[in-house]
């Protein structure tokens, strides 16, 4: 059965979202049709507003509605450390943790030569420029995902930064709480041992 054109367009629009297949998109489209008119208008306004009002902070690449994000404009943050993350959602997760009070730098991706993503396509050049302009930074913490792309990006950034004499560290990666050593892969075990702390 063919849906009326407006419904078909809405289904296609929902399918552009990650993880949304045709069945889920169809359900969402019919749910949207059943929503009160005011809710649909609020929803569409929110979509338009996020595209119009949200941009990248020119300093760190975080998302913000202000000229400079709240983290970069906060003088109470530790100005000596910059934590490098892949996406703004990673920054948000680390902020929710409440343990880190330094600065951030958001790459908006990782190096992936197979996908045609090189250093120019991610926010690496601005990180290096930022470090060259700021003598206060003593440590860069690489907090990228433990994927092959994340690993290669970390290595690439580390090689660029180390000659400047800035300390480069990475988040400790290892065994999850409650996991069995026998089921862990060798990379996880190696990192767990190398990242050990004295009790």
Swiss-Prot record:
- The UniProt record lists the Toprim domain at 80-176
The record places its C4-type zinc fingers at 57-72
Q: Give the InterPro entries listed for this entry.
A: DNA_Rcmb_RecR, Rcmb_RecR, Rcmb_RecR_Znf, TOPRIM_dom, TOPRIM_RecR
Sorted alphabetically, which keywords does the UniProt record give? DNA damage, DNA recombination, DNA repair, Metal-binding, Zinc, Zinc-finger
Q: Does the keyword DNA damage apply?
A: yes
Molecular function GO terms recorded: DNA binding; zinc ion binding
Q: What GO terms describe the biological role, i.e. biological process, of this protein?
A: DNA recombination; DNA repair
SUPFAM superfamilies per the record? Recombination protein RecR
Q: What does this protein do?
A: May play a role in DNA repair. It seems to be involved in an RecBC-independent recombinational process of DNA repair. It may act with RecF and RecO.
Family statement drawn from the similarity comment of this UniProt entry: Belongs to the RecR family.
Q: What is this protein called?
A: Recombination protein RecR
Source species of the chain: Lactobacillus acidophilus (strain ATCC 700396 / NCK56 / N2 / NCFM)
């Amino acid at each position: 059965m063919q849906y009326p054109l407006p419904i078909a367009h809405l289904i296609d629009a929902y399918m552009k979202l990650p993880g949304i297949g045709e069945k889920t998109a169809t359900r969402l489209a019919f749910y949207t049709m059943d929503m009160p008119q005011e809710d649909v208008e609020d929803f569409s306004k929110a979509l338009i507003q996020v595209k119009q009002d949200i941009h990248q902070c020119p300093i760190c690449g975080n998302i913000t509605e202000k000229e400079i994000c709240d983290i970069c404009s906060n003088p109470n943050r530790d100005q000596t450390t910059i934590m490098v993350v892949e996406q703004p959602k990673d920054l948000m997760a680390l902020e929710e943790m409440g343990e880190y009070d330094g600065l951030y730098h958001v790459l908006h991706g990782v190096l992936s030569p197979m996908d045609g993503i090189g250093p120019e396509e991610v926010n690496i050049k601005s990180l290096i420029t930022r470090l060259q302009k700021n003598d206060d930074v003593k440590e860069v913490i690489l907090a990228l995902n433990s994927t092959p792309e994340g690993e290669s990006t970390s290595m690439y950034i580390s090689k660029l930064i180390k000659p400047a004499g800035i300390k480069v560290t990475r988040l400790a990666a290892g065994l999850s709480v409650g996991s069995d050593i026998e089921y862990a892969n060798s990379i996880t075990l190696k990192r767990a041992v190398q990242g050990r702390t004295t009790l």
